[in-house]
Regions:
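Domain-level signal for soluble alpha/beta catalytic cores
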Residues: 1-180
Length: 180
């Protein structure tokens, strides 16, 4: 999830191709290129799809190191703008991120793209990729309390990632039902 690895575009493509082929051949309507820490990897996957499966719709979601930077150090605006040339990408966003990063990142993305915006952050628990452990800090707002802010900031596809559960997903569903 840190993006601190280097492969060639061809190596990224060889790694992802078997799963992509299985999913596309099974008839998926949209392919999730999710939890991506590295722009070069995303672009390699998109080039592969453009050549082999040009009709396949996808969405891309990045992991973040802060509200303006994806995990490999690429500025978020650059990572979002890089997707604009790919007509197959119908939505962009972030996932597996801390709650406090979501709203500022959404506002940033909304200024760059007209594509649908996706967020599915972790609950308030925080993951440390070095120790591979979760901790529960005291936060100023809960997942449930922040959903309206994310919607207001432009998110139209909202879900949950690590340590979210039925309570958080119900809160998203209830909010969407009230605000259609």
């Amino acid at each position: 999830y840190r993006g601190d690895y280097e492969l060639s575009a061809e190596e990224y493509q060889q790694f992802h191709l078997p799963r992509i082929e299985e999913l596309v051949n099974a008839g998926v309507d949209i392919l999730a290129i999710e939890t991506q820490p590295k722009l070069d990897e995303v672009l390699a996957i998109l080039e592969l799809l453009k050549k082999k499966y040009p009709q396949q719709k996808v969405y891309v979601s990045y992991t973040l190191s802060d509200d303006d930077t994806i995990s490999d150090g690429t500025p978020l605006p650059r990572a979002i703008h890089a997707l604009e040339d790919y007509s197959q990408v119908i939505a962009v966003g972030i996932n597996c991120v801390k709650l406090e990063l979501v709203e500022p990142a959404l506002k940033n993305m909304k200024e760059i793209t007209d594509k649908h915006l996706i967020v599915y952050p972790n609950s308030s628990a925080v993951y440390d990729p070095k120790s591979k452990t979760w901790s529960q800090p005291k936060t100023s707002a809960t997942f449930e309390e922040l959903i309206p802010n994310w919607y207001e900031a432009g998110a139209r596809i909202i879900g949950g990632c690590c340590t979210t559960g039925p309570k958080e997903i119900k809160a998203v569903a209830d909010f969407i039902k009230r605000n259609r």
